[in-house]
Design a protein with these regions (language model features):
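Small-molecule-sensing regulatory modules
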Residues: 23, 29-173
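A conserved helix-loop-strand patch within extracytoplasmic ligand-binding domains
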Residues: 1-35
Length: 173
């Protein structure tokens, strides 16, 4: 998110985020400095508008839910998950129901098997890496045209590692 019509005059550009995973991916793009950004979405946007940051990274789902894409003060650029890898499980909706209930039968019909397979694969990778919520690790899996695809990024002491793999959906687990 940037302020509409504002061109940053400072170098490096200051980008705000609260996520270590996002910070390391932003730093790949050259002339930028990452600064910690805290607060609710309105607070973060106000800090951007007041000039504390040249841009901030926010989840599109949250901006959409809050109706903020219509705010005329801001410009929005969407980062593709294949390139700017999200946290594992991002975007998944989970619903709990009592075992054996009628609700569970309905929910099973609504379940997206491809999304479920992707989630299980992402969670398995996170477990294998021992990645907690503060780790700079991203994993994104999806099925497309009969192929299972996964992208992974992880910060190490030697820098950022990125990997992409693909294969048959039945081999995803």
């Amino acid at each position: 998110v940037t302020v509409k019509g504002r061109t940053p005059e400072r170098s490096p550009r200051i980008i705000g985020t609260g996520s270590p995973r996002r910070q390391v991916q932003i730093m790949e793009h050259g002339d930028v400095e990452c600064r910690l950004l805290r607060g609710n979405v309105d607070t973060r946007l106000e800090k951007l508008y007041q000039g504390e940051y040249d841009g901030i990274i926010l989840a599109a789902a949250g901006l959409n839910r809050l109706g903020l894409f219509n705010d005329p003060r801001f410009s929005f650029e969407f980062l593709e998950p294949e390139m700017f890898i999200p946290a594992g499980g991002q975007g998944i909706i989970a619903v709990e129901a009592k075992k054996g209930s009628e609700v569970l039968k309905i929910l099973k019909k609504l379940n997206d098997k491809e999304a479920e397979r992707a989630l299980f694969a992402e969670r398995k990778v996170l477990r294998l890496l021992g990645a907690g919520c503060t780790a700079a690790v991203g994993v994104y899996a999806k099925e497309e045209n009969g192929t299972f695809w996964m992208g992974l990024m992880r910060e190490t002491k030697n820098g950022l590692i990125r990997r992409k793999i693909s294969g048959a959906p039945e081999d995803s687990m």
